């Protein structure tokens, strides 16, 4: 009848309705009682509760309910692989994530491999944003089975939107690194040259990402950048690259530019070739890794990249 009867510490018997905030069960029986009261048929919870599952189920069944189906997910870890703890303050809150990326990127991150412990820290945000939009772009070309396995189908209840991200989030961070933009309108000058049909009005996801990218860059990338001077081999290769760019007549074709950058590294004897690209990132962007450099040139601009190389070789970035 929705009441609970108990004896208090003085031996008096009380009967109270369980509604209206009169009672609160201890946390272990609360799970099972809630399942029975609300006819819960599916419950997911962290693995720290998994050892108590038989207790929860037993309480639910004792109250006349049917234990729900369970899904137990792994816990999130911090950057160093330690369990996230409120007392340590080593976690990344939802509000913090949403200060640097759209809600859907967080949903995408959480969807991935729920039974695997995932490191959740600020550095994973750009990757989550770009992978989410990759899945959006792939969705229209997929078979029904592939679409049902695509996270965006579940995130958007079968009706995922069309991605209007003409520039990846990671590339926006690199653009912010060299563009000196104070607000997203400064980034849009480069974006529109790269994708003339794009605009803040026609590409709201892109516009939002541009604002997020500037904030993320200023808070996390800029304080950690470390520029260095090039080695003799790198200097010769960068001078060659700048010379080829000065006479470049291939437009803003990212693939053609990437092929040319690749050829410069090969001709200057970089082995493995990864060392050539690492040198470009460290000398020009102050980072140990970065985008496909041809795509970066196409977005930032050929003349602007020549000028950037000149400043780096002159030691002005160090």
Region roles according to the model:
Residues 61-68, 271-272, 315-318:
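Secondary-structure transition/capping motifs at alpha-helix termini
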Residues 1-88, 94:
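Active-site cores that bind ATP or allylic diphosphates and position pyrophosphate for catalysis
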Residues 48-53, 74-215, 285-318:
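Catalytic adenosine-cofactor/nucleotide-binding cores of aminoacyl-tRNA synthetases and other
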Residues 35-44, 88-92, 242-246, 259-266, ...:
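Glycine- and acidic
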Residues 70-73, 108-112, 121-124, 188, ...:
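Short coil/turn segments at secondary-structure boundaries
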Residues 199-252:
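Aromatic-anchored, charged helix-turn/loop surface patch used as a conserved interaction hotspot
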Residues 56, 102, 280:
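Residue-level signal for inorganic ion chemistry
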Residues 229-282:
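C-terminal accessory/binding modules appended to enzymatic or scaffolding proteins
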């Amino acid at each position: 009848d929705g009441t609970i009867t108990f004896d208090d510490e003085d031996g008096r018997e009380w009967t109270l309705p369980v509604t209206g905030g009169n009672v609160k069960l201890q946390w272990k029986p609360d799970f099972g009682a809630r399942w029975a009261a609300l006819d819960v048929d599916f419950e997911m919870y962290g693995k720290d509760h998994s050892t108590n599952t038989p207790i929860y189920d037993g309480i639910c069944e004792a109250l006349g309910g049917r234990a729900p189906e369970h899904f137990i997910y792994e816990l999130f870890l911090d950057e160093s692989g330690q369990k996230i703890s409120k007392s340590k303050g080593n976690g990344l809150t939802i509000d913090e994530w949403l200060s640097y990326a759209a809600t859907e990127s967080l949903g995408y991150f959480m969807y991935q491999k729920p039974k695997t412990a995932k490191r959740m820290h600020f550095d994973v945000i750009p990757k989550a944003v770009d992978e989410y939009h990759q899945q959006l772009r792939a969705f229209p070309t997929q078979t029904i089975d592939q679409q049902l396995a695509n996270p965006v189908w579940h995130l958007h209840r079968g009706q995922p939107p069309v991605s209007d991200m003409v520039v990846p989030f990671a590339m926006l961070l690199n653009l912010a690194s060299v563009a000196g933009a104070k607000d997203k309108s400064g980034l849009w000058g480069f974006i529109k040259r790269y994708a003339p049909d794009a605009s803040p009005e026609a590409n709201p996801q892109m516009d939002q990402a541009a604002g997020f990218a500037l904030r993320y860059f200023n808070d996390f990338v800029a304080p950690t950048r470390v520029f260095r001077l090039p080695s003799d081999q790198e200097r010769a290769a960068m001078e060659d690259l700048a010379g080829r760019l000065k006479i470049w007549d291939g437009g803003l074709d990212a693939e053609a530019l990437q092929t040319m950058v690749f050829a410069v590294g090969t001709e200057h004897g970089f082995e493995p070739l990864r060392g050539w690209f690492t040198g470009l990132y460290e000398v020009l962007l102050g980072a140990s890794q970065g985008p496909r450099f041809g795509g970066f040139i196409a977005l930032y601009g050929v003349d602007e990249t020549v000028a950037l190389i000149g400043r780096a070789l002159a030691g002005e970035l160090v």
